[in-house]
A protein has these predicted regions:
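Phosphate/diphosphate ligand-binding glycine-rich loop within oxidoreductases
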Residues: 39-101
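Short, Asp-centered acidic motifs that coordinate Mg2+ and/or phosphate
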Residues: 38-40, 61, 143-144, 171, ...
């Protein structure tokens, strides 16, 4: 019996060799399979919330092939007793991509997840702000501002005029979702020379043109993921999925418990 569903197959070339007993679907493909059999669901882009959890009533684990959890409704998963674990892919590529975009001088890093922690090992002269810490504005002592935060209610529009207003000639580097940036404010900050350069690596394209028209913004689509040429680790994914089936998951984002239905 197949009890594994892997969605968003764009990063999955050759995964069948490592996980032969799985259903594998693209992001837009509808699952035509016995949904009650699925115990482990792995996603990269697809959202996991009420619809998914009700479609797969016996789901036990979600294995997220990304960073952060903004596409996973953790509250809903918790209510349904479904555990969540991340493969934390592309840490090396993302952290080195950020490092190579930094200018001389002190750096402030927003977010303290796996990519941020690896970046901290690669650089000196930095200060870290946990995403739970609310900062209204940054003092003019840093030359680089780095965003590694996930998108949630508290980080939406986080990088705005108020945050940067006391700074001058600053380099901003972000791998966060597009909605964490207030693009109109970023344009204003560039016009006032508070920001001298911006590097954003994300799939979002919201009002991207007005940023690019400043000629001071480099906007790429997840180039950092493959920055060092590392391929996706199918063996690691296979091992994590097996640990879910064995109910022996290390360092889950959310622990599994017996399903709690409404």
């Amino acid at each position: 019996m197949k009890n594994i569903l892997i969605k968003d197959k764009s990063d999955l070339d050759g995964v069948e060799e490592f996980i032969p007993n799985a259903y594998i679907l693209g992001a837009m493909e509808k699952p035509n399979l016995p949904s009650e059999d699925i115990k482990v669901l792995s996603t990269k882009f697809s959202k996991v919330g009420r619809t998914t959890l009700e479609r797969f009533p016996n789901l036990e684990w979600v294995v997220y092939r990304g960073h952060g959890t903004d596409s996973i409704n953790l509250d809903m998963c918790s209510q349904h007793g479904v555990g969540v674990v991340s493969t934390n892919p592309n840490i090396e590529g993302c952290s080195h991509w950020i490092k190579d975009k930094l200018k001389d001088g002190e750096t402030i890093i927003f977010g303290n997840g796996s990519i941020s922690k690896r970046l901290q090992q690669l650089i000196t002269d930095y200060h870290v702000v946990d995403s739970k810490t609310k900062i209204i504005h940054i003092d003019d002592e840093y030359k680089n501002v780095v965003s590694c935060v996930s998108l949630n209610q508290s980080t939406e529009d986080m990088f705005n005029y108020e945050l940067f207003k006391n700074m001058n000639d600053v380099n901003f580097v972000s791998i966060s979702r597009a909605k964490t940036h207030n693009n109109k404010d970023l344009v204003k900050l560039i016009e006032e020379n508070k920001l001298s350069s911006i590097f954003i690596d994300t799939l979002g394209t919201d009002v991207r043109d007005e940023l690019l028209n400043t000629n001071k913004v480099t906007y790429t689509k997840h180039m950092s993921w493959d920055y060092l040429g590392h391929k996706n680790d199918h063996k690691k994914l296979s091992e994590i999925i097996q640990s879910c089936l064995d109910d022996n998951v290390e360092n889950p984002i959310l622990s599994r418990r017996k399903n709690q239905w409404f």
